[in-house]
């Protein structure tokens, strides 16, 4: 929000500069797969769960793919690591809450209330038994799920701090430009200093 408002910048934010340099190192020192800039999510899943990738950022929607490998001790999970010398927070796992629902007060009638009640009462069951993802509701996990659900849930229960992703803070034009610059940074086309200068120019102070 500070960046979008022009009150903060990459050049003035130590955490942002650290992240820029980290992305540059990961991209230019061989940590990403060849041709990573053109890889879609399905291809990335196949690479990781096929045993060729080492680290993959994903959500509970892929637990069904990870279940057998996790049970066999072939993969594990870890939260966002702390950074030495930085102001770290105790909440170290991103929790994505899905989509918001909006209702029109003028047309909200008994039928809509019945639907809303039904949705809330059955949403958790649909998450685990149909969509196979974590439910956003703070309810007990049902029995019979893959072990990975039970082992990762404590990280969410202990989360104390919430934050908003860049996708929601920035307008679409600025977000698109930053993503384009990230691609160039990770491929070594631009330097960290060039990235910082360019991205700071996207927002008027």
Predicted segments with their positions:
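Periplasmic solute-binding protein
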Residues: 1-5, 20, 88-104, 153, ...
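Beta->alpha turn/N-cap motifs
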Residues: 41, 58-63
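Glycine-centered hinge/linker elements that transmit conformational signals in sensory
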Residues: 6-37
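Extracytoplasmic/periplasmic substrate-recognition and gating elements
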Residues: 29, 68-133
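C-terminal capping/gating helix-and-loop segments adjacent to ligand/active sites or protein-protein/ligand interfaces
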Residues: 129-136, 140, 150-204
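Short, hydrophobic alpha-helical packing/hinge segments within bilobed ligand-binding/sensory domains
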Residues: 44-48, 65, 112
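Short helix-initiation/N-cap motifs at beta->coil->alpha
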Residues: 35-49
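Alpha-to-beta junction loops
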Residues: 50-59, 73
């Amino acid at each position: 929000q500070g960046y979008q408002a022009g009150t903060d910048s990459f050049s003035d934010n130590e955490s942002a500069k650290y992240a820029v340099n980290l992305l540059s190192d990961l991209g230019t020192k061989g940590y990403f797969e060849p041709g990573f800039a053109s890889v879609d999510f399905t291809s990335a899943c196949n690479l990781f769960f096929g045993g060729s990738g080492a680290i993959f950022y994903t959500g509970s929607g892929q637990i069904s793919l990870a279940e057998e490998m996790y049970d066999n001790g072939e993969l594990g999970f870890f939260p966002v690591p702390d950074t030495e010398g930085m102001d770290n927070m105790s909440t170290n796992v991103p929790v994505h809450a899905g989509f918001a629902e909006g209702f029109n007060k003028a047309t909200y009638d008994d039928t809509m209330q019945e639907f809303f009640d039904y949705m809330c009462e059955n949403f958790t069951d649909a998450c685990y038994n149909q969509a196979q993802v974590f439910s956003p509701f703070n309810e007990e996990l049902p029995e019979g799920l893959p072990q990975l659900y039970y082992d990762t849930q404590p990280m969410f229960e202990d989360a104390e701090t919430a934050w908003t992703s860049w996708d929601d803070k920035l307008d679409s034009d600025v977000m698109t430009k930053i993503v384009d610059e990230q691609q160039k940074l990770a491929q070594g086309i631009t330097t960290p200093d060039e990235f910082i200068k360019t991205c700071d120019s996207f927002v008027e102070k």
